Structure formats: structure tokens, C-alpha cells
């Protein structure tokens, strides 16, 4: 059994006991989170969401992804710019699919 949820502007296919990485959610590690924007579960297709359906998970970790280096160079001058970015993420383990 699987479900398709919408979170952080993305759609994810999730199953029970699966670990997913989503954008940072303001909760502490060990807390429970419930996703209510369910697009598909048990053969039911939502219009746009399935009513009375939810996916529950436990937050395992809050962290930062690997650094992405952004480099900009203008070849006709000596202008160079180098930046780094580390995206914040939340690691969630799916515990229950209801619906």
C-alpha cells in the first residue's frame, strides 16, 4: 500500500516504514507529524485531496544537505563571485497510512 502526498510544493510517493527527506519543518526530533494533503491512497484519487486520509510520521533528524557551490564569472572583466548554499532538510520516517 502506498500514498502520494503533497508537501513543500512537491509530490512524494510514500510507503509504511519508508524514510523521506522534505524541506525543513519547524518541529523537534522525535515529534510526530501528520500530512493531510493526500492526493492518492488505496486506489482513491483525490479532487484535489482525498477526504479523511492522512499519513503520519516521526521526525528522525533535522539537518543541512551537502554544500552546492554557485560560481559566476564575467569573462570580459575580472568580476568573479563564488557562493555556497546548504539547504535545510527534515528526515521523516513514515509510520502510518490512514484512509
UniProtKB/Swiss-Prot annotation:
Keywords: Ribonucleoprotein, Ribosomal protein, RNA-binding, rRNA-binding. GO terms for biological process: translation. It holds the Pfam family Ribosomal_L21p. Transmembrane segments: none annotated. The keyword Protein transport does not apply. One of its GO terms (molecular function) is structural constituent of ribosome. One of its GO terms (cellular component) is ribosome. The keyword Transferase does not apply. It comes from the Bacteria. Belongs to the bacterial ribosomal protein bL21 family. Part of the 50S ribosomal subunit. Contacts protein L20. This protein binds to 23S rRNA in the presence of protein L20. This is Large ribosomal subunit protein bL21. The gene is rplU.
Amino acid at each position: 500500500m502506498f500514498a502520494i502526498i503533497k508537501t513543500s510544493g512537491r509530490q512524494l510517493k510514500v510507503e509504511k516504514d519508508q524514510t523521506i527527506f522534505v524541506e525543513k519543518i519547524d518541529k523537534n526530533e522525535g515529534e510526530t507529524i501528520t500530512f493531510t494533503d493526500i492526493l492518492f491512497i488505496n486506489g482513491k484519487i483525490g479532487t484535489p485531496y482525498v477526504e479523511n486520509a492522512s499519513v503520519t510520521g516521526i521526525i528522525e533528524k533535522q539537518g543541512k544537505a551537502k554544500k552546492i557551490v554557485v560560481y559566476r564569472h564575467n569573462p570580459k572583466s575580472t568580476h568573479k563571485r563564488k557562493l555556497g548554499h546548504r539547504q535545510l532538510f527534515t528526515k521523516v520516517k513514515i509510520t502510518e497510512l490512514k484512509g
